[in-house]
């Protein structure tokens, strides 16, 4: 359980104002110049020592990612913050953007300094109108007070931060598709290599980080890497904002330690499963793109490694709870439709496969299929997984794989009830 004094996002519910003065009372922008004066190597080393792993889903070491940037680049360097939060069941970054914008802006300044970038872009989801408005007001305040811009915080470092609104494409949450969109092109993922650290925005060295990953950096530097590393579990350190939605009594966002038991999160903060824990059917633990877990596995600890051992993943930390009233086959079919709709169409396995999977899933929903089609569907998901430029193909395949792994009997019963053997 996270102690009150260890919380990083103290205004996650918007109970206080998000303006500069209120944010400073909560500790934001405190002696930022002193943190910058410690130098780039110190900042990167502290972030590495803290064990901070990317909070956008991949879980890659944030400090390690920063260290890939060239030290003496002839080209300008860029920091890009991925605020294109579009994963079904995920809304953690949304609350940070609207209620804790100054934490993000301060984090952008420090991260930009650490990687040698004088320009930062915050790419925000197009539908986040109010969040974009709050962010822009916060940026205007920071510029007015000299916290960012020329000679930011009196540090001698120039850093301009710009807000760029997306246009509603889920695929632009993929880092290279996001860069394409920023450049004014159609949001389609790039082949890697080259990686963004060598050839990113406008062909220049670029680091792309998630909102939460950047927003926690100032607090880590103030309190020390050892403080952050002592929270959570080895290799899964610090705090994490979890989103709990679906069939719970009180849907909410909550900051807790990495490794907190899934059942404890739901019982303590979300008022429990609707109808009690025994009424639980399944949980998607990390946003729509990770495989679901049946009730028997739902007391797992919420961290990257523990969830991997049970065949799922932490992803974004978006917990979707489904009780026994759920048509689990239709629920996953609905996700299949989402991924079919959001595929950019660049890769054949994803372009053709997502539509094919959705059509088969809808037949399974009705039971109008043959039993051998279950294995055919599973085989197709494995042909898509790992055979596309970006991870959208994997994201479309994994929910179906989880469904077949844990609820094959229910699919077969649906087919039997329809009357086709």
UniProtKB/Swiss-Prot annotation:
Positions with a binding annotation for FMN: 166-213
UniProt catalytic activity: a quinone + NADH + 5 H(+)(in) = a quinol + NAD(+) + 4 H(+)(out)
What InterPro entries does the entry give?
A: ComplexI_51kDa_subunit, NADH-UbQ_OxRdtase_51kDa_CS, NADH-UbQ_OxRdtase_suF, Nuo51_FMN-bd, Nuo51_FMN-bd_sf, Nuop51_4Fe4S-bd, Nuop51_4Fe4S-bd_sf, SLBB_dom
Enzyme class name: translocase
Q: Provide the binding site for [4Fe-4S] cluster.
A: 344, 347, 350, 390
Enzyme Commission code: 7.1.1.-
The record's GO molecular-function terms, alphabetically, read:
4 iron, 4 sulfur cluster binding; FMN binding; metal ion binding; NAD binding; NADH dehydrogenase (ubiquinone) activity; quinone binding
Keywords from the UniProt entry: 4Fe-4S, Flavoprotein, FMN, Iron, Iron-sulfur, Metal-binding, NAD, Quinone, Translocase
Cofactor binding description: Binds 1 FMN. Binds 1 [4Fe-4S] cluster.
Top-rank lineage group of the source organism: Bacteria
- List required co-factors: FMN; [4Fe-4S] cluster
Q: Where, by residue number, does NAD(+) bind?
A: 54-63
Q: What does this protein do?
A: NDH-1 shuttles electrons from NADH, via FMN and iron-sulfur (Fe-S) centers, to quinones in the respiratory chain. Couples the redox reaction to proton translocation (for every two electrons transferred, four hydrogen ions are translocated across the cytoplasmic membrane), and thus conserves the redox energy in a proton gradient.
Belongs to which family?
A: Belongs to the complex I 51 kDa subunit family.
Name it. NADH-quinone oxidoreductase subunit F
This chain is encoded by the gene named: nuoF
């Amino acid at each position: 359980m996270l102690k009150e004094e260890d919380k990083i996002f103290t205004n996650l519910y918007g109970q206080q104002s998000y303006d500069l003065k209120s944010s400073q009372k909560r500790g934001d922008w405190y002696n930022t110049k002193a943190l910058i004066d410690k130098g780039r190597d110190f900042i990167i080393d502290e972030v590495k020592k803290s064990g901070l792993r990317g909070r956008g889903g991949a879980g890659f070491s944030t400090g390690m990612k920063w260290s890939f940037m060239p030290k003496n680049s002839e080209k300008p360097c860029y920091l890009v913050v991925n605020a294109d939060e579009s994963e079904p069941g995920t809304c953690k970054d949304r609350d940070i953007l609207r209620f804790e914008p100054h934490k993000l802006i301060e984090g952008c300044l420090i991260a930009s300094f650490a990687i040698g970038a004088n320009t930062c872009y915050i790419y925000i989801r197009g539908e986040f109108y109010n969040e974009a408005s709050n962010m822009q007001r916060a940026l205007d305040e920071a510029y007015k007070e000299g916290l960012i811009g020329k000679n930011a915080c009196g540090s001698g470092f120039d850093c301009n931060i710009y807000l760029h609104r997306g246009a509603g494409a889920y695929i632009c949450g993929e880092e290279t598709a996001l860069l394409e969109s920023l450049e004014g092109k159609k949001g389609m993922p790039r082949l890697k290599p080259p990686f963004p650290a060598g050839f990113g925005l406008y062909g220049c060295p670029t680091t792309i980080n998630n909102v939460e990953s950047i927003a926690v950096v100032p607090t880590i530097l103030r309190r020390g890497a050892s403080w952050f590393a002592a929270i959570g579990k080895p290799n899964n350190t610090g705090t994490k904002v979890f989103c709990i939605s679906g069939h719970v009594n009180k849907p909410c966002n909550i900051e807790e330690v990495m490794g907190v038991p899934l059942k404890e999160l739901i019982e303590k903060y979300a008022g429990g499963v609707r109808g009690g824990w025994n009424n639980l059917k399944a949980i998607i633990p990390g946003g729509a793109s990770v495989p679901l877990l049946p009730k028997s596995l739902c007391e797992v600890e919420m961290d990257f490694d523990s969830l991997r051992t049970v065949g799922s993943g932490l992803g974004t930390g978006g917990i979707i709870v489904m009780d026994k009233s759920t048509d689990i086959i239709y629920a996953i079919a609905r996700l299949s439709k989402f991924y079919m709709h959001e595929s950019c169409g660049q890769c054949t396995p994803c372009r053709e496969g997502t539509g094919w999977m959705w059509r088969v899933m809808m037949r399974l929903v009705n039971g109008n299929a043959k039993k051998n089609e279950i294995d055919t569907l599973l085989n197709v998901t494995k042909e898509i997984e790992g055979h596309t430029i970006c991870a959208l193909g994997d994201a479309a395949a994994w929910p179906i794989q989880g469904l077949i792994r844990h609820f094959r009997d229910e699919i077969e019963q649906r087919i039997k009830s329809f009357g086709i053997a």
